């Protein structure tokens, strides 16, 4: 099932008991965060606050608060089915040459589908039903959440930022938080390696001193939103990828103030520009690490136009110590990464980003080990293959007899198959998340790899331990007589 706009997805969630409407007045200042956090930790539904205090616009929260809802947004019922998305991405990133004529013929539909999914431009889009310019532009009229007591100001969190570099044929879609600075100003917090910042840097180089057009879409359809946070191949637009997932082309329209294309079904569109000479101090804000981050200077986004649907819905979230919505999104997208990594490294059995590791700061990988040093090769590959893992600080590699998603198994492997000196890899001066205050220098720190695999000849001179395993025939016999033993086989045993 596909969803052409946010409202159809809301209806689907409500019909399936995955969305709760809250009519009681709730303040976007702190109160929404506390409610959303409690509900998310209880694995509860998405929330639609129908009467935000001092605002007339409803607020949608916890939309992707469970892996199941992320899967539902992509037309799947089970998060494990998201591996199909990963298979598609793996194919698009590095299509294998056909093994013969029949194989070539079988690949034609996928190539044809990929080529036939450019966005579709529509007229009279829903996102431009209401247009505000000049003095009518007032961002304070939006029910922007003030998430934590130490936050400096309200924060736009789910804004889909649309940019284009002067040397690129396609637009970039990225999600960057934006601090409310005034009635028509936001601070655009994009890190230097992100697509929007790279586009801006290219523009400044080619057109020094000129204003850079930017558009932010709020409340787009769920597939387009998720397309902006998946590892789409560089040559493919997020709009085209969203169309592939949806099975039909993404509908877009031209912005009113520039040539950028925006999702036509979005609830709210913010249009404007960034003056290369206007910067402002951003933060502090409570972040996905569970701490308030340091302040830093980022470009100011001046909003010249606000367009929206009639009776728009404001889509929002909060970030904090896991579990939070980004962590749940990470759990779901974990299944997307597995086929992509396996495509490059077939020896990988499974890959896990523990949500308590702030979505990406720790990874655990199980492999079918084939030679000495194999675990270290996989570590280096994981750090370098996808840019999503350039900030991963810790990688643990285990054998295929260890469940990399079970901490009991992983800790057992670390404590029995590792020598701290021999099996620990330390790399200095690597890219680190700017929000990581534990690194000695902002944006630069070290990485650690833990080889918790069984060691082979060349890695050790000692006789290696053999795991204890019960005789299968004995296990089978005990299974057959278990009910007669009168033992409660509850999980507490």
Swiss-Prot record:
It comes from the Bacteria. Pfam families: UbiD, UbiD_C, UbiD_N. Keywords: Cell membrane, Decarboxylase, Flavoprotein, FMN, Lyase, Manganese, Membrane, Metal-binding, Ubiquinone biosynthesis. Its main location: membrane. SUPFAM superfamilies: FMN-binding split barrel, UbiD C-terminal domain-like. Mn(2+) binds at residues 172, 238. It is a peripheral membrane protein. Its EC number is 4.1.1.98. GO terms for molecular function: 3-octaprenyl-4-hydroxybenzoate carboxy-lyase activity; metal ion binding. The active site is at 287 (proton donor). It is an enzyme of class 4 (lyase). Its cofactor is prenylated FMN; Mn(2+). It is found in: Cell membrane. It catalyses: a 4-hydroxy-3-(all-trans-polyprenyl)benzoate + H(+) = a 2-(all-trans-polyprenyl)phenol + CO2. GO terms for biological process: ubiquinone biosynthetic process. One of its GO terms (cellular component) is cytosol. InterPro entries: UbiD, UbiD-like_C, UbiD-like_N, UbiD_bacteria, UbiD_Rift_dom. Catalyzes the decarboxylation of 3-octaprenyl-4-hydroxy benzoate to 2-octaprenylphenol, an intermediate step in ubiquinone biosynthesis. Homohexamer. This is 3-octaprenyl-4-hydroxybenzoate carboxy-lyase. It comes from Shewanella sp. (strain MR-4). The lineage of its organism: Bacteria, Pseudomonadati, Pseudomonadota, Gammaproteobacteria, Alteromonadales.
């Amino acid at each position: 099932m596909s969803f052409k706009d946010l409202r159809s997805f809301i209806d689907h969630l409500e019909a399936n008991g995955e969305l709760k409407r809250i009519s009681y007045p709730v303040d976007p200042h702190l109160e929404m965060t506390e409610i959303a956090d409690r509900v998310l930790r209880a694995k509860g539904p998405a929330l639609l606050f129908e009467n935000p205090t001092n605002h007339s616009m409803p607020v949608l929260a916890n939309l992707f608060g469970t892996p199941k809802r992320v899967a539902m947004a992509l037309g799947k019922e089970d998060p494990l089915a998201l591996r199909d998305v990963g298979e598609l991405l793996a194919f698009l990133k590095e299509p294998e040459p056909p093994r013969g004529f029949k194989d070539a013929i079988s690949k034609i539909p996928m190539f044809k589908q990929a080529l036939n999914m450019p966005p579709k431009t529509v007229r009279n889009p829903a996102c431009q039903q209401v247009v505000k310019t000049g003095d009518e532009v007032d961002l304070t009229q939006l029910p922007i959440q003030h998430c934590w007591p130490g936050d400096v100001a309200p924060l736009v969190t789910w804004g889909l930022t649309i940019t284009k570099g002067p040397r690129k044929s396609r637009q970039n879609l990225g999600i960057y938080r934006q601090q409310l600075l005034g009635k028509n100003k936001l601070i655009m917090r994009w890190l230097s390696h992100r697509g929007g910042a790279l586009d801006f840097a290219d523009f400044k180089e080619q057109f020094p001193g000129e204003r850079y057009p930017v558009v932010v879409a709020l409340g787009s359809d769920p597939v387009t939103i998720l397309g902006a946070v998946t590892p789409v191949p560089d040559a493919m637009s997020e709009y085209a990828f969203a169309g592939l997932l949806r099975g039909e082309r993404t509908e877009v329209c031209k912005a009113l103030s520039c040539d950028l294309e925006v999702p036509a079904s979005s609830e709210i569109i913010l249009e404007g520009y960034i003056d290369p000479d206007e910067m402002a101090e951003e933060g502090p804000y409570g972040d996905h690490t569970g701490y308030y981050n340091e302040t830093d200077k980022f470009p100011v986004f001046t909003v010249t136009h606000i367009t929206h649907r009639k009776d728009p819905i404001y889509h929002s979230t909060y970030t904090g110590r896991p579990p939070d919505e980004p962590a749940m999104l990470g759990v779901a997208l974990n299944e997307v990464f597995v086929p992509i990594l396996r495509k490059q490294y077939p020896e990988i059995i499974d890959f896990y980003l523990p949500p308590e590791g702030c979505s990406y700061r720790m990874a655990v990988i199980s492999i079918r080990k084939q030679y000495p040093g194999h675990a270290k090769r996989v570590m280096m590959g994981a750090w370098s293959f996808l840019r999503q893992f350039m900030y991963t600080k810790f990688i643990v590699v285990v054998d295929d007899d260890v469940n990399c998603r079970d901490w009991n198994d992983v800790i057992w492997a670390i404590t029995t198959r590792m020598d701290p000196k021999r099996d620990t890899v330390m790399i200095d001066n690597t890219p680190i998340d700017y929000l990581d205050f534990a690194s000695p220098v902002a944006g630069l720190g070290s990485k650690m790899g833990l080889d918790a695999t069984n060691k082979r000849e060349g890695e050790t001179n000692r006789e290696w331990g053999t795991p204890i395993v019960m005789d299968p025939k004995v296990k089978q016999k005990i299974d057959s007589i278990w009910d007669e033993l009168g033992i409660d086989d509850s999980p507490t045993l």
